[in-house]
A protein has these predicted regions:
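A short helix->loop->beta-strand "cap" motif at the edges of active sites that frequently abuts
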Residues: 131-135, 155-157, 233, 291-293, ...
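Rossmann-like dinucleotide/phosphate-binding beta-alpha-beta segment
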Residues: 200-291
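Rossmann-like dinucleotide-binding domain for NAD(H)/NADP(H)
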Residues: 292, 299-404
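Phosphate-binding beta-alpha-beta segment of Rossmann-like dinucleotide-binding domains, i.e.
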Residues: 155-211, 223-226, 230, 396
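An N-terminal-biased, well-structured beta-alpha scaffold segment characteristic
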Residues: 2-159, 282
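Short glycine-/small-residue-rich Rossmann-like dinucleotide-binding loops
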Residues: 117-118, 265, 271-273, 299-300, ...
């Protein structure tokens, strides 16, 4: 879930039921479970005597690490409603299945769906959700390139996201990838476990004094830049929306993207995926990189053209690559494939490459980030229950992407 969490404009490229496959639902009742007649905005009386409302939500692609924070946030929201608002009892229907055309019917009986980065909210899915009475798509992430927003607007389905949670989580993971690659930590650990204490092949380099190119200086990019400044690095940045305060604070130099590529020893991508930023790193741009540079991507997999990266790794044009995201990660990440043969030959090659380190889209995965994601997601769900979803004219383009 590593889309850039910036509140400024996103950086560009810098210029029926029978057809559903077997699912594994994990139903979870709220702290005080509503009866069937109380669901769908049914009213009841809370312990303090105030009238309350209820809401049923289908949570797709759920896992224990995010379902527990969601349950906790729902309980707290019910116990501590705003002074002028009734308590909201949210019933969460946890589903391990991803949301797509085959599983959309699992949301029957719910007024909202809660989705993640690998769910496919296409026009066809939205039409099915509309027919089921779903009124809100609540993204528990920042990225939304998997949602057909125009279709949602036409169908009158609201879409909300979590525009920012913990920039530190993702920025720190980018630094972790860099450090592990540079000092060959994975290889060194494997050797020691095998009883091999030799040091050949483990030589790294000092980060101090190196030039680091930060592509995208929103909240995550700025946080990453501050960390690298602490290592004593020279900082270059490329972003059409310049953060002059950041530049002054860190001595960061803004420059054109080609210049950044040519001068940087390390390039770190902190961008959302847009039509303009798709394949920002391609055969042409990667050819401009300083030879042997390290490339880090915790933004979106589609920012890098995989074939171009592989060619550059083979030629030595790219010295090392740390990837928390992958262009074809859909259907691979967030699942256990350890008992099967990996059919993606490009990914298989990258995994075997000694100077490539891949993590499975986990940069966001900290306790603090998960708590913030849950709190804002529940706030968006509560807005539906309380009749506070904005109209189309009032959509802010940040937290709310489509209204009624």
């Amino acid at each position: 879930m590593n889309a850039e969490l910036q509140t400024q404009p996103p950086s560009t490229a810098l210029s029926a039921l029978s057809s559903i496959p077997a699912a594994k639902p994990r139903a979870s009742a709220p702290e005080t479970a509503p009866t069937s007649s109380e669901r769908h905005h049914g009213s009841r009386v809370s312990p303090n005597g105030a009238a309350s409302v209820s809401l049923s939500v289908a949570v797709f692609d759920s896992h224990k690490y995010d379902s527990d924070p969601l349950k906790e946030a729902c309980a707290k929201a019910r116990q501590n409603p705003p002074p002028d608002k009734p308590p909201v009892s949210i019933e969460l229907r946890f589903l391990e299945s991803n949301l797509d055309v085959h599983t959309a019917a699992l949301a029957k009986g719910c007024e909202a769906v809660c989705v993640f980065v690998n769910d496919k909210i296409s026009e066809q899915v939205l039409q099915e959700l509309k027919s089921l009475g779903v009124r809100l798509v609540a993204l528990r992430c920042a990225g939304y390139n998997n949602v057909d927003l125009q279709a949602a607007k036409r169908l009158g389905i609201a879409v909300a996201r979590v525009p920012e949670y913990s920039p530190h989580a993702i920025a720190e993971h980018a630094v972790a990838l860099l450090l592990a690659l540079n000092r060959k930590l994975v290889r060194a650990t494997q050797r020691v476990r095998d009883g091999n204490f030799l040091l050949e092949g483990l030589v790294g380099f000092d980060l101090f004094g190196k030039t680091v190119g930060v592509v995208g200086t929103g909240k995550i990019g700025a946080t990453f830049a501050r960390i690298m400044h602490g290592f004593g690095c020279r900082l270059l940045a490329s972003d059409p929306v310049r953060n002059e305060a950041l530049a002054k604070e860190l001595g960061l130099e803004y420059c054109d993207f080609p210049v950044l590529l040519e001068q940087s020893d390390i390039v770190s991508l902190h961008l959302p995926l847009t039509p303009e930023s798709w394949h920002l790193i391609n055969a042409d741009s990667i050819g401009r990189l300083k030879r042997g540079a390290t490339l880090i991507n915790t933004g979106r997999g589609g920012l890098i053209e995989t074939e171009a990266l592989i060619a550059a790794l083979k030629s030595g044009g790219v010295g090392a690559a740390g990837l928390d995201v992958y262009e074809e990660e859909e259907g691979v990440f967030f699942a256990d494939h350890s008992g099967t043969v990996l059919t993606d030959e490009k990914l298989a090659w990258l995994l075997m490459c000694p100077n490539v380190l891949i993590t499975a889209h986990q940069a966001f995965l900290t306790k603090e980030a998960l708590q913030q994601l849950a709190v804002v997601t529940v706030r968006n769900l509560r807005a539906l229950a309380n009749g506070e979803v904005p109209g189309q004219a009032d959509v802010d383009g940040q937290q709310w992407l489509a209204g009624f």
